[in-house]
């Protein structure tokens, strides 16, 4: 048994307290605890504590320190359960204590993967042009379950996805593209697929926001590609065969047969 003889607040952290006990005729430092543990365990001057009690007090203090670490981590933004668990492991917290803290945070609704997923999707929709498949991937990387992700994605309807793609396409209209209208559309389609939109959503958006080069710009692009193809094949082919090679090259670039014939007949 040991008797607590003195309790002092720490100079650098007024939420932690140093506990002193009587030993060999004098006061000696025994351990320190968080204020929450001090109150919960009823620590006070004159209290007798045995080795088992001290062990429990120190365990509670480790739990509280880990809880405080998690709260600090959560103070910057919402996190998934997986993110908090990973963070605490990196801080060398023990597994049983981590699970204890995660359970406590969840009970207090400070951790909620469904709320996190919904907030994550809402923020990304407002600040980026990412589609549902990309958002699903990013949430999975944060350890959110597929069931939870699917539930949260119901807030991002098909119609809203189409509208978001249309808004993105409108922004692309003012950009310069040296190529055919078809090649431009294909390039934008690839970008949208990479952003996480499905083909049906993309096609519906294109139907409402047609992507087409100005005729003069497309004609200039065709001539540039045509001249390049002519130089490439001129040393190998002549006459009709040369024209066919150039025609094939331009067709692969997405130019219409009508424009290609016009170029070759000029």
From Swiss-Prot:
Recorded GO cellular component terms are: cytoplasm
Q: Keywords in alphabetical order, please.
A: Cytoplasm
The record's annotation in InterPro entries points to: RecX_HTH_1st, RecX_HTH_2nd, RecX_HTH_3rd, Regulatory_RecX, WH-like_DNA-bd_sf
Whether Cytoplasm counts among this entry's keywords is: yes
Keyword Protease appears in the UniProt entry: no
What family is this protein classified in?
A: Belongs to the RecX family.
Supply the name of the protein: Regulatory protein RecX
Report the source organism. Answer: Halalkalibacterium halodurans (strain ATCC BAA-125 / DSM 18197 / FERM 7344 / JCM 9153 / C-125) (Bacillus halodurans)
What would be the name of the gene that encodes this protein? recX
């Amino acid at each position: 048994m040991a008797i607590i003889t003195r309790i002092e607040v720490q100079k650098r952290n007024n939420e932690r307290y140093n506990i002193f006990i009587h030993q060999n005729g004098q006061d000696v430092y025994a351990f320190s605890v968080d204020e929450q543990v001090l109150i919960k365990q009823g620590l006070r001057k004159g209290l007798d504590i045995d080795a088992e009690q001290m062990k429990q007090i120190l365990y509670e203090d480790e739990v509280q320190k880990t809880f405080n670490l998690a709260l600090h981590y959560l103070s910057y933004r919402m996190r998934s359960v997986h993110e908090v668990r990973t963070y605490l492991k990196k801080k060398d917290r023990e597994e049983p204590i981590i699970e204890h803290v995660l359970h406590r945070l969840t009970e207090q609704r400070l951790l909620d993967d469904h709320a996190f997923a919904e907030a994550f999707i809402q923020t990304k929709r407002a600040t980026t042009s990412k589609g549902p498949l990309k958002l699903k991937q990013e949430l999975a990387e944060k350890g959110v379950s597929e069931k939870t992700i699917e539930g949260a994605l119901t807030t991002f309807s098909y119609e809203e996805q189409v509208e978001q793609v249309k808004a993105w396409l409108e922004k692309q209209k003012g950009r310069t593209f040296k190529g055919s209208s078809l090649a431009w559309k294909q390039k934008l389609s690839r970008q949208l697929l990479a952003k996480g939109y499905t083909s049906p959503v993309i096609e519906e958006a294109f139907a409402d926001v047609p992507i087409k080069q100005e005729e003069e710009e497309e004609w200039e692009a065709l001539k540039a590609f045509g001249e390049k193809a002519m130089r490439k094949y001129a040393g190998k082919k002549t006459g009709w065969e040369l024209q066919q090679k150039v025609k094939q090259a331009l067709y692969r670039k997405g130019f219409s047969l009508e424009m290609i014939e016009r170029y070759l007949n000029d």
